[in-house]
A protein has these predicted regions:
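An aromatic- and histidine-rich active-site surface loop
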Residues: 71-82, 92-124, 298
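Acidic donor-binding loop of glycosyltransferase active sites
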Residues: 282-298, 311
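A short, active-site helix/loop in glycosyltransferases that binds the activated sugar's phosphate group
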Residues: 150-178, 182-190, 199, 225, ...
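Glycosyltransferase donor-sugar binding loop
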Residues: 42-46, 185, 217, 241-256, ...
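Short hydrophobic beta-strand element within catalytic cores of glycosyltransferases
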Residues: 308-315
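Membrane-proximal helix-turn-helix segments that form the acceptor-binding/catalytic region
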Residues: 138-156
């Protein structure tokens, strides 16, 4: 039996960010596996254990200490893993750490886990130190943390080829062992019908209609280029609306209003968040087009979901996005007027042209990003780790 300890997601089941969805899908696809046993750290206000998808979910009590919570949580979870491995005499465990938050403490825990006969794998996420939401000292910490985790890990598991190249080139002095396994996405359609009451009432409350809107779904942070997308949409001549599904940050929203006066354009609609996955999938399917402005990070879950659901995708032209979508999308730059022109072109496209792009997008997901495929890649990685 290969025991795998996963540290760094908020836990399962729960409100899903990228890592949480990944852990949920991995344990779901492997729940009947006879040779893999998962132990998943879960951030909580109490301690305890439960079984979910046949994984042992162990709760780590985290005090409310502001931004340092994430670092405290990972360290406490690693300490718990070490205790459990030792007490239960588990042979050859794998500890898989998601994100690079605990670099200064990494050497200590790697030594400890090696002493217990285990290996430490790290998923480096995507350039956390570049994210504009962090103040300069925090960004500096993330960069140092990434460096130290790369130095001490037995293997860096990168969910994007761009991230893998970056790790190899920037940390060549450490000669890091790396491998590439992407994030995944669903390839099925939503379970909701076009006339489902839940969908129709969501549309009615927000004055939206199927194929009458362009869509974006994502975290409301500057590096996702909301400013460019809203500005360009306001410049465009489209009669469709721009529906923005996000957890609004008032400070950033005020900044955008000050710069763009978007409230004067009735086509710009902030429509709240949607945590019902079937409803969100249906909203994606019914969008005329999807905008993706993410500029920082590896393989983005929201982009994969868009390619799996929406036929017409308009993506910011950066390496990460091209790597994922290839020829299955249209691309825009941050040059003034570029996205506005692309929206005009998109509005003029025939249904046949849109269908061809949609089929390419779904095929791309099925070929390289389905959860079934990703789970099989991880199975191979974990079961062959000690060979």
């Amino acid at each position: 039996m290969q025991h795998v300890f996963i540290v760094g997601s908020k836990g399962i089941p729960g409100a899903y960010g990228g890592y949480e969805t990944f852990v949920d899908k991995l344990t779901q696809y492997h729940q009947d596996h006879t040779q893999l046993r998962y132990h998943v750290a879960c951030k909580d206000t109490t301690v305890g254990e439960e079984i979910y998808h046949n994984a042992r979910c162990f709760h780590i009590k985290v005090p409310n200490i502001g931004p340092a919570q994430a670092i405290y949580y990972d360290i406490a979870a690693l300490a718990d893993c070490c205790r459990y491995i030792e007490n239960n005499k588990i042979e050859k465990p794998i500890v898989y750490i998601l994100a690079c938050r605990i670099g200064p403490f990494m050497a200590h825990y790697v030594r400890k886990i090696h002493k217990l006969g285990g290996l430490v794998f790290v998923n480096p996420d995507g350039h956390e130190w570049l994210r504009a939401k962090w103040p300069a000292p925090v960004r500096k910490y993330w960069k140092i943390s990434e460096q130290l985790m790369t130095k001490h890990a037995d293997l860096m598991v990168c969910d994007s080829k761009n991230i893998e190249s970056y790790i190899r080139e920037n940390y060549a002095a450490f000669a890091p062992a790396t491998t590439y396994i992407s994030y995944g996405a669903e390839t099925r359609k939503s379970a909701l019908a076009d006339d489902d009451e839940k969908l129709l009432s969501w549309y009615a409350e927000r004055d939206l209609t199927a194929k009458g809107y362009y869509l974006v779904v994502g975290r409301f942070v500057p590096e996702n280029n909301y400013e460019t997308m809203i500005r360009e949409f306001m410049k465009s001549d489209t009669e469709r609306v721009f529906a923005i599904i996000t957890n609004v940050n008032d400070k950033f929203l005020e900044e955008l209003e000050e710069k763009l006066h978007y409230k004067e354009d009735p086509r710009i609609k902030f429509v709240g968040t949607v945590y019902d996955q079937e409803l969100l999938m249906k909203i994606r399917e019914n969008a005329y087009g999807y905008f993706h402005g993410h500029e920082v990070g590896g393989t983005n879950p929201s982009l994969l979901e868009a390619l799996g659901c929406t036929e017409l995708n308009l993506l910011l032209n950066v390496g990460f996005n091209r790597e994922v979508a290839e020829e299955a999308a249209l691309y825009w730059s941050k040059e003034p007027g570029d996205l506005a022109n692309l929206i005009h072109k998109a509005d003029q496209m025939s249904q046949e042209e849109i269908t061809v792009l949609g089929e390419k997008a779904k095929q791309r997901i099925a070929d390289a990003y389905s959860w079934q495929f990703i789970a099989a890649e991880y199975e191979k990685l974990f079961l062959e780790a000690f060979q």
